[in-house]
């Protein structure tokens, strides 16, 4: 009873999460958005099944199809059947293809496994499903999955695939098998190589009119033997003897979700002879084949891998001004998971780059992780029907603006605070952008060093700053006073690298102010252009005012 209650709660939570992400559209707009995406997916399907070509990556197709289904459920439409081929000249399957239900996570899989025994895990091979019918020991018919009840006659094509046994004996002599035709790979590592659009490539080869030698690049993985031997071990042995060796090699007994997770992770990183997109867990005990129907298999489930790239909805476009005054564009996203990382924002780059991408709220973009786990945009895979793009701020900022706070300087001013607190500058540990915003909003800083005047009481009474953290911050701010002179000059944004600044041997503000352009130009990595920037910087009125203020605070190197 407890198990069923847990399953019910899990389902309700899943339904709640679906409704929580329903778009806030009017009925008219919902109809338009659903219709447009439905038409696009239908166009992709037509090309896929009629010409054997894929105009879109498998992963993008799957995720946009799921997005369409979600929208249809949100607005009361009938969800479409995904990847349903035309049924001209279709052949009945002796045993229906049931399909496989997907588990959202390990917990859901664990709940499913608790009620079952004699369980086995197999790789979820990424290809196209097929029925193989053997009669009197010979391959009699090969049928594409189709809609699960009917499919296309693929007998001629499959007979040319050398990996498919044309004759069998013993219990298999009069049998029906279900499996996956896949693209044979040598040492395919899913974690590194991804899906390589394998499903579309296999479909393309099977749909071509010419019987080319390329069919020998295909293999078959049998995952079901309806009405076969009762024991899984007997099934695997007979299949291996007949030539279906991969099934025995890649089918393992499992007792719980932890064991499945270990195998799943192993196959994710291992060299395999095929592309996979997860694992399938199945019970050895299956109902008689006459009870098999599409979408009604309770004896097996899939636990798919997380896609290397995820389709994410753009919720908003935001503009940020960096410490140098450059405007960058950030897309705020509906949260997606990438490699156990929750991604809600992705940097687009400059305003020009954003305009080239042509991204607006409501668009669907493909996001992946670049080096060091930084999210990046790979493509814009779908644009909404109604697109309103925000106006970027005026390009009025530069490297010498916003040392002092003002309404128009809000973003660049905060960026300067974040910069000066960094480890390589003043090393103010424990405070980031959110903390600086909280301090500035409460205490209305005059300039980028106003935080030096904050008292322990002021820090303790700052909304958004925990009382336990306020004492630590006050200690950090006091320690900053003892930082070397060069660190403070870096905090002021001098346009030099740390190496060049250290090589200058400048030890005081007065010495720095009297240094000439020729002096700066001689420093390593500093040309005439950079030297002129240093002169402009030190002669700027805001910089001079900050220097005088730091002198009054008796900061090292600034004293008269």
Curated annotation (Swiss-Prot):
| Catalytic EC class | ligase
Q: What is its EC number?
A: 6.5.1.2
UniProt cross-references to SUPFAM superfamilies, sorted A to Z: DNA ligase/mRNA capping enzyme, catalytic domain, Nucleic acid-binding proteins, RuvA domain 2-like
The record lists the catalysed reaction(s) as: NAD(+) + (deoxyribonucleotide)n-3'-hydroxyl + 5'-phospho-(deoxyribonucleotide)m = (deoxyribonucleotide)n+m + AMP + beta-nicotinamide D-nucleotide
Keywords, sorted A to Z: DNA damage, DNA repair, DNA replication, Ligase, NAD
UniProt GO BP: DNA repair; DNA replication
Q: A Gene Ontology molecular-function term?
A: DNA ligase (NAD+) activity
Entry annotation: catalytic residues: 124
Ranges in a coiled coil? none
* Stored Pfam families: DNA_ligase_aden, DNA_ligase_OB
Q: Which HAMAP family did the record assign?
A: DNA_ligase_B
* Primary role: Catalyzes the formation of phosphodiester linkages between 5'-phosphoryl and 3'-hydroxyl groups in double-stranded DNA using NAD as a coenzyme and as the energy source for the reaction.
- Family membership: Belongs to the NAD-dependent DNA ligase family. LigB subfamily.
* Protein's recorded name: DNA ligase B
**Which species does the entry assign this protein to?**
Escherichia coli O9:H4 (strain HS)
Gene symbol? ligB
